[in-house]
Regions:
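Signature of N-terminal electron-transfer/Fe-S-associated modules in redox systems
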Residues: 2-153
């Protein structure tokens, strides 16, 4: 299991001119994200990779994954789109529960232990956190969960 660390960011100043020593600062904390990695071009076996990050209190799991991809390991693969909990493209298992990475705040998880991030179950894994959604969409098309208008109006 590989470990990666990011440099510690300075706290962010929200409002200039506020009184108090920490007024307007967003506190930071250290967190370990444990990502289930899988690359069929390299091996048919999955493995775990730990990433040690310093994150802000307002960050979500998606922010941590972005930080990992952009600053530590560009090969980490995951889906994301709207980042507002609408599209569902960043669905994954976070600490054993199916969740949206864009809606899950890190501060709501137990950060004293590694946060486990893995692909959702029940669909074939293509790479890292990306699953093949075609079986889901095929079942969706078969049940036709929408209205069909037979009239010309």
């Amino acid at each position: 299991m590989a470990e990666h660390e990011t440099p510690e960011p300075e706290s962010v100043k929200l409002f200039e001119g506020m009184s108090g020593s920490d007024s307007g600062n967003i506190p930071t904390y250290d967190v370990t994200i444990r990502v289930r990695r899988y690359n069929p071009e390299v091996s048919d076996k999955a493995y775990w990779d730990d990433f040690n990050l310093t994150m802000y209190r307002t960050d979500r799991v998606l922010d941590a994954l972005h930080k990992i991809k952009w600053e530590l390991d560009g090969s980490v693969s995951f889906r994301r789109s709207c980042a507002h909990g609408i599209c569902g493209s960043d669905a994954m298992r976070i600490n054993g529960r199916n969740r949206l990475a864009c809606k899950t705040l890190l501060k709501d998880l137990d950060i004293t232990k590694p946060i486990i991030v893995e692909p959702i179950k029940g669909l074939p894994c293509e790479k890292d956190l990306i699953v093949d959604m075609e079986p889901f969409f095929q079942a969706y098309r078969e049940i036709m969960p929408y209205f069909i208008n037979d009239s010309n109006e």
